[in-house]
């Protein structure tokens, strides 16, 4: 008899909301030369192919910095830098184009693979490259001629979208042509950023050696706002050693993400190119695995609507089955939905509570407090309590009370005091379930 893996089934079920959310969305994936050189590169390509098979429109922008350095060193060519940009002269341009071209063909070959017993089995991807980017020279700055180092002049947005709509993966590199028929070496971060902005992409995704941005305790920072990124970049500018390419690579992505975020790209993600499956875990799991840069938090506390009933029902049902919450039918939820507040994360209901006012006694009950098991370490229950207190005060409520069988100590920590049944409003007192023997706790507002 075959052993069935419940973990696999659970993973599929948990990822389903994200599969639906990402389908049809445009994501610009920035794959640096460091990621391509890593042994995990084949797995990253498989994950990008998986994104495509799940209905995501993928634009893949690759860099070639370490490969260019390697081929220049091999041919004893030295290219100086000015303000962090490589000066690509006539003699080194051919080598730069060679390195970038080899990577483009290597990526295309990987995406074209469909061998049995591999993650790419059965895939038939169309990978499209072309003159979607028109470049121009950077020119001369402070007397320094950038030669064949350039910047973007325009992007063929219509052409890229047409290829995406036809089901192709669009592959862009750091070499682009100009209207004069010349080739210029561009910063891949700038290509990815401008493409994401012009396409109005839903996400910009980059790779780094670590699991995103790591804090002083060694933990990945799940979410950063633009102001956080600005401070972080300034700190890295002072602390990065001149030869620390990993630090500079991460800093370049943060600058790109900051620019993209402020130009309207909702989210940018930074994940590890060393960790197998990091891209999939970041996009298709509850908490992700890397760092995302957002204009506004992915979580928000808001008034529940009729569309949230399914999410609330799924959240509270396990607690009802355990006897922690009083059972509520779907019909009751529909009738009382205006009394509910939820915590919404990417369209998922991860927390809820309800507020039942008794205006004559100037009292209100906070009930049906539930937090998703994956999110019980983030003080979300406290956030719901603060929100309920604010709502109650606006209604002119003087006392907020709860009935609980399991969370007495937590509510006492928040300032609630235990009272007897007689302290309840008359209407609630008549409905008190003596068999359930819930503790009654009250807070003066």
Swiss-Prot record:
Domain of life: Bacteria
Protein's UniProt keywords contain Transferase: yes
Keyword Heme: no
Location, primary (coarse class): cytoplasm
Record-level Gene Ontology MF annotations: L-glutamate N-acetyltransferase activity
Family in the record: Belongs to the acetyltransferase family. ArgA subfamily.
Protein name in the entry: Amino-acid acetyltransferase
Broad enzyme group: transferase
Catalytic activity: L-glutamate + acetyl-CoA = N-acetyl-L-glutamate + CoA + H(+)
């Amino acid at each position: 008899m075959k052993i069935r893996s419940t973990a696999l089934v659970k993973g599929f079920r948990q990822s389903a909301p994200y599969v639906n959310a990402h389908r049809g969305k445009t994501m610009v994936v920035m794959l640096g030369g460091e990621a391509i050189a890593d042994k995990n590169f084949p797995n990253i390509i498989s994950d990008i192919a998986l994104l495509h098979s799940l209905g995501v429109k993928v634009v893949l922008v690759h860099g070639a910095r370490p490969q260019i350095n390697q081929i220049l060193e091999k041919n004893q060519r030295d290219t100086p830098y000015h303000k962090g940009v490589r000066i690509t002269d006539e003699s080194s341009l051919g080598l730069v184009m060679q390195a970038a071209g080899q990577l483009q063909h290597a990526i295309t070959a990987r995406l074209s693979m469909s061998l049995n017993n591999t993650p790419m089995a059965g895939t038939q991807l169309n990978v499209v490259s072309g003159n979607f980017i028109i470049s121009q020279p950077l020119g001369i700055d402070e007397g320094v001629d950038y030669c064949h180092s350039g910047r973007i002049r325009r992007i063929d947005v219509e052409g890229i979208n047409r290829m995406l709509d036809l089901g192709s993966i669009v592959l862009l590199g750091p070499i682009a042509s100009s209207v004069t028929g010349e080739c210029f070496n561009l910063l891949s971060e700038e290509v990815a950023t401008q493409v994401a902005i012009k396409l109005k992409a839903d996400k910009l995704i980059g790779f780094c050696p670590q699991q995103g941005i790591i804090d002083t305790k060694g933990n990945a920072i799940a979410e950063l706002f633009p102001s956080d990124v600005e401070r972080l970049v300034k700190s890295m500018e002072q602390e990065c050693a001149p030869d620390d390419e990993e630090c500079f690579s991460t800093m370049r992505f943060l600058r790109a993400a900051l620019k993209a975020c402020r130009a309207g790209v909702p989210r940018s993600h930074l994940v590890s190119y060393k960790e197998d499956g990091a891209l999939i875990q970041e996009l298709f799991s509850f908490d992700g695995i890397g760092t995302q840069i957002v204009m506004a938090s992915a979580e928000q506390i808001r008034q529940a609507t009729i569309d949230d009933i399914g999410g609330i029902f799924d959240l509270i049902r396990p607690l009802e089955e355990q006897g922690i919450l009083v059972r509520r039918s779907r019909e009751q939820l529909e009738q009382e939905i205006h009394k509910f507040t939820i915590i919404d994360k990417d369209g998922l209901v991860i927390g809820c509570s309800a507020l039942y006012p008794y205006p004559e006694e100037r009292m209100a009950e906070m009930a049906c407090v539930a937090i998703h098991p994956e999110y019980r370490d983030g003080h979300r229950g406290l956030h719901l309590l603060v929100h309920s207190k604010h709502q109650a005060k606006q209604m002119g409520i003087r006392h907020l009370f709860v009935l609980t069988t399991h969370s007495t100590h937590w509510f006492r920590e928040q300032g609630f005091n235990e009272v007897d049944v007689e302290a309840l409003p008359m209407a609630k007192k008549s409905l008190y379930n003596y068999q359930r023997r819930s503790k009654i706790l009250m807070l003066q507002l």
